[in-house]
Amino acid sequence: MPIPVKLPPTFADVLEKAEQPLVGAWICSGSEAAAEIIASAGFSWTLIDGEHSPYGLETILSLLRATDAYGVTRVVRVPVNNTALIKQYLDLGVQNLMVPMID
């Protein structure tokens, strides 16, 4: 029997369907509780900042899990423009990436 999976909308979908300006919040704390509060606060999107923080893959995964239940669109900023690292973030289930330092 197939297991239904409901993913949050992508950031592009949220932008496309927006009829008014969108408001989002950046998650700059490694706290799952803080991430959960932000995700449940009614923002259009949240961004988990992996560039200007000491987060490893484990912390990113725990923040994604903490915000899963709220259906908010999540963007994750990776620390560097590195193909191998970006693939690891995608393996975690990240749907929307912000990649820094692209020339």
Model regions and ranges:
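Active-site-adjacent beta->alpha loops and helix N-cap segments on the catalytic face
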Residues: P2-A12, H52-Y70, N81-K87, M101-D103
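Generic ordered-secondary-structure signal
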Residues: I3-K6, A25, A35-E36, S40, ...
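Glycine-rich, proline-tolerant flexible connector loops at the mouths of alpha/beta enzymes
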Residues: A34-S62
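Short, flexible loop/turn motifs enriched in small residues
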Residues: S31
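Short, surface-exposed connector motifs at secondary-structure boundaries
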Residues: K17-E19, G42-T46, T67-V72, L90-N96
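N-terminal amphipathic alpha-helix/helix-capping segment at the start of soluble metabolic enzymes
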Residues: M1-C28
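Hydrophobic faces of well-ordered beta-strands that scaffold small-molecule active sites
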Residues: P21-W26, T46-I48, R74-V78, L97-V99
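Catalytic cores of alpha/beta
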Residues: E36, S40, V76, N81-Q95, ...
